[in-house]
Amino acid sequence: MAQFVFESDLHSLLQLDAPIPNAPIARWQRKAKEATGPAPSPMRAANRSHSAGRTPGRTPGKSNSKVQTTPSKPGGDRYIPQRSASQMEVASFLLSKENQPEDGGTPTKKEHQKAWARNLNGFDVEEAKILRLSGKPQNAPEGYQNRLKVLYSQKATPGSSRKACRYIPSLPDRILDAPEIRNDYYLNLVDWSSGNVLAVALDNSVYLWNAGSGDILQLLQMEQPGDYISSVAWIKEGNYLAVGTSNAEVQLWDVQQQKRLRNMTSHSARVSSLSWNSYILSSGSRSGHIHHHDVRVAEHHVATLSGHSQEVCGLRWAPDGRHLASGGNDNIVNVWPSGPGESGWVPLQTFTQHQGAVKAVAWCPWQSNILATGGGTSDRHIRIWNVCSGACLSAVDVHSQVCSILWSPHYKELISGHGFAQNQLVIWKYPTMAKVAELKGHTARVLSLTMSPDGATVASAAADETLRLWRCFELDPALRREREKASTSKSSLIHQGIR
């Protein structure tokens, strides 16, 4: 009986159509169970595997981790701004600024305000980031040198900067004939008015050339044979022309009416230099005396200055009218006050360093106490003086006779005219006195220089009987328009009356 029971059990085991008790669960059952419920204990699975004598389905002692899935709800952003570095005040200012009307400040004022804000805040408010994702970099240690230091300059550098040097034409813009001009170093034969009219003395006549229209007019001609014109000078307003003659006369002409207003005779020798200071006309003669004429009154001769022993060939009032500079054939430069002192008319300064006749005298237009003088053939020097202290600021050997000096009102430069051997015009940089350019073309010595009212053109009269116009101080068009708008017309004091 027991044999039949054993066979029945063996047959049921070999059929394999029933689940095996205590056997490991199938893989598909395990996967389904893991998806719906907690995973089975690792120890229990390991025990079942070893009890059955089969290879385990997973590493013993290692838990079966759950598969990572994308969360259904969004989490926080990793890019969180730092509250300490956030420009919350700037954000509030910019939001409130949108509702405010724009002020009518000038572009220059806005640029200054922008530069101040950049220096104070360390950044541009208009372009500042409100939220910062990281802190500012640390400053460089003290004394650290960086080759790119220019990138961290306090001052904003423009994207494009204009070249420091400018173009100076080496050829004259125009050449005019000046026949019978007297080849005399001591005379002053050309002057340019504020009305853009050039006066030229040719022997015994005075001609006027209108630079705007090109018209030429003969203003006067001496009546006596042998007499000639020795000097010309326009009043500042440009309506009246003073003419010095070889017969010791000073004539005053109304150019618009082409009429001589008066003839002033107080000198004893030819009048070789003239200079205006409002209604006071100063004249220097071969006798060495300087006379002041008040053209408003009948008794015009109001003062006599005696500071030279030979001919006064250079005479120029300062732009502010406080000082008068005179240069003579006695190699002396005197600086006179505008009025007499306690001891009368005495020079404030007397300079004796020149070794030749001093015809070239010119005042600096932007610094009223600076005077430039040039000596003749025996001296060949240009000297810069401080008339307040009496000090010679600089002296340059130009290796030729100096006939005239002019300052440029647009550039910190001056131009000088020279004689033998090259008869050239030289532009100098102030205060270094470095040579900027040389303008050549005259075949004989330069006698006189004068400047156009806009300060862009220099006219040079030379012994080769030519008058050359050099556009050596041409102004930038944008800057010229600004200065033209800022300039104001002044009424002439001469209209108070000329008798």
From Swiss-Prot:
Residues with N6-acetyllysine modification: K66
Cross-link (Glycyl lysine isopeptide (Lys-Gly) (interchain with G-Cter in ubiquitin)) at residue(s): K485, K490
Keywords per UniProt: Acetylation, Cell cycle, Cell division, Centromere, Chromosome, Cytoplasm, Cytoskeleton, Isopeptide bond, Kinetochore, Mitosis, Phosphoprotein, Repeat, Ubl conjugation, Ubl conjugation pathway, WD repeat
WD repeats: 182-221, 224-263, 266-303, 307-346, 353-395, 397-438, 441-480
Modified residues (Phosphoserine): S41, S72, S92, S153, S161
Phosphothreonine sites (modified residues): T70, T106, T157
Disordered: region residues: 27-80
PROSITE patterns in alphabetical order: WD_REPEATS_1, WD_REPEATS_2, WD_REPEATS_REGION
Location relative to the cell: Cytoplasm, Cytoskeleton, Microtubule organizing center, Centrosome; Chromosome, Centromere, Kinetochore; Cytoplasm, Cytoskeleton, Spindle pole
Biological process, per Gene Ontology: anaphase-promoting complex-dependent catabolic process; cell division; metaphase/anaphase transition of cell cycle; metaphase/anaphase transition of meiosis I; mitotic sister chromatid cohesion; mitotic spindle assembly; positive regulation of anaphase-promoting complex-dependent catabolic process; positive regulation of cell population proliferation
Pathway(s) annotated for this protein in UniProt: Protein modification; protein ubiquitination
Gene3D superfamilies for the chain: YVTN repeat-like/Quinoprotein amine dehydrogenase
Pfam families found in the cross-reference section: WD40_CDC20-Fz
Comp. bias (Polar residues): 61-72
SMART domains, sorted: WD40 (SM00320)
PTM info: Phosphorylated during mitosis. Phosphorylated by BUB1 at Ser-41; Ser-72; Ser-92; Ser-153; Thr-157 and Ser-161. Phosphorylated by NEK2.
Any one Gene Ontology molecular-function term assigned to this protein's record: histone deacetylase binding
InterPro entries: Cdc20/Fizzy, WD40/YVTN_repeat-like_dom_sf, WD40_CDC20-Fz, WD40_repeat_dom_sf, WD40_rpt
Annotated GO CC locations: anaphase-promoting complex; centrosome; cytosol; kinetochore; mitotic checkpoint complex; nucleoplasm; perinuclear region of cytoplasm; protein-containing complex
Similarity-based family: Belongs to the WD repeat CDC20/Fizzy family.
Protein function: Substrate-specific adapter of the anaphase promoting complex/cyclosome (APC/C) complex that confers substrate specificity by binding to substrates and targeting them to the APC/C complex for ubiquitination and degradation. Recognizes and binds the destruction box (D box) on protein substrates. Involved in the metaphase/anaphase transition of cell cycle. Is regulated by MAD2L1: in metaphase the MAD2L1-CDC20-APC/C ternary complex is inactive and in anaphase the CDC20-APC/C binary complex is active in degrading substrates.
Quaternary structure and interacting proteins, as annotated: Component of a complex with CDC20, CDC27, SPATC1 and TUBG1. Interacts with NEUROD2. Interacts with dimeric MAD2L1 in its closed conformation form. Interacts with BUB1B. The phosphorylated form interacts with APC/C. Interacts with NINL. May interact with MAD2L2. Interacts with CDK5RAP2. Interacts with SIRT2. Interacts with isoform 1 of NEK2. Interacts with HSF1 (via phosphorylated form); this interaction occurs in mitosis in a MAD2L1-dependent manner and prevents PLK1-stimulated degradation of HSF1 by blocking the recruitment of the SCF(BTRC) ubiquitin ligase complex.
Name of the molecule in the record: Cell division cycle protein 20 homolog
Phylogenetic lineage: Eukaryota, Metazoa, Chordata, Craniata, Vertebrata
Gene: Cdc20
